[in-house]
Structures are given as C-alpha cells and as structure tokens.
Amino acid sequence: MSSIYEKSIINYHLLHPKLQKRYQLDGSHTFSGTGTMSEISGGSFLVRMLLKLGVFFRCFFSERGKDIPFTIQNRTCLLKSQHTGIEWNRTFFFKGKKRFFDALMIYDEKENRILDFFGKPHLLLSVLTFEASLDGSLTITSGKQWLLICGKRIPLPKWLTGTSEVCETFDEKKNCFTIEVHVQNTILGTLFFYKGTFQEEERES
C-alpha cells in the first residue's frame, strides 16, 4: 500500500532514495530520528510573546538558540473517520526545558492534497504542497489556513497566516538528513526559522 506522501508528492520519483524511504510511512513503516538544530531564530518580541501561547497546544514556542538537540518521530494512526493519519512529533531540548511541535497530517482524497493539523489539541489547519526537485530534495509549502475552534474551521485571511517553506535533503557525505524551515508573515516578517541535521535511529532487531 502506498503512503499518503507517495500519492501527493509532485515528482516523487525524483526524491533521493533515503527521502523516499523516509516518507514511505504506512502501517508497516515508522520513522524515528535524532539530531541537532544548528539555529532556531526569528520573531520580534511581540511575535515571541504570542508564540508562548503555543506551548499549551504543543505546537509553537518562543525559545531560540543554537545547537539545540531534538528528536522527531513519525508514525501512522487510524482516525475515527477511518482515514490514516501520520503523526509528526518533534521535541526540542533547550537548557532546563523541553518544547514540542506536534502535528497530524492526513490525505484529502477529493482534493489530492495533504492537510496538516497543528497542535494537541488541534489549533491550526493548513494545506501543504510537496514537491521533489532534480537534486533529490523535497520542498514543502503551506497554502490556505484555518483556525480550529470548537470543532469549526475559521478561514484565516492571508495577512493573518504564517506562510511556511520547508526544504529537506539527504547529505551523502555526512550521511544525514538536513532540514530548513522558514515561516513568515506578510506584515510581521519572519516568525520562525530553524535549520539542522538528523539521522534515523537504528531499530532494534
């Protein structure tokens, strides 16, 4: 059975083999990785104060720094709607505290797109577009967004959204994945930026 990413990634065949394996997330394949964010930055004082609220939803945080250890876990889950979801659970280890960035992605069969639900409980919903490039990298960009309140989806105007661009590659020389994430707003500029590397954890046989 093909994963939701095989269905939705534009030019999936161009992905580096390691990235193809990484995104082959289905009932039989999970992914666990550990790494270091060389930089976590971005956001004015006001933005960072607002991001503090995200801690209660396990999706945003205001801490910034360099060389921050982190883990990432992806696994499938069966939702009440009988859809298959992919959990994205990221943990960042700052000095004396942990911060979380959790999300759930599902495949929208009707629109042939990925829907990304941020937070636990879900706070924000975004449409994501995935596209592979000739160099084997993967670019993920966000589209339309909704605020989730009391089971309702409230469309957000563009000036209130955080537009994200993610670039993920595999560095053969260093034998690791690289990640760079940039989230910005048309009025406030950069809200959040991080970049780093990670490796897949060895599974117990």
From Swiss-Prot:
InterPro entries: DUF4166. This is Uncharacterized protein YndH. Pfam families: DUF4166. It comes from the Bacteria.
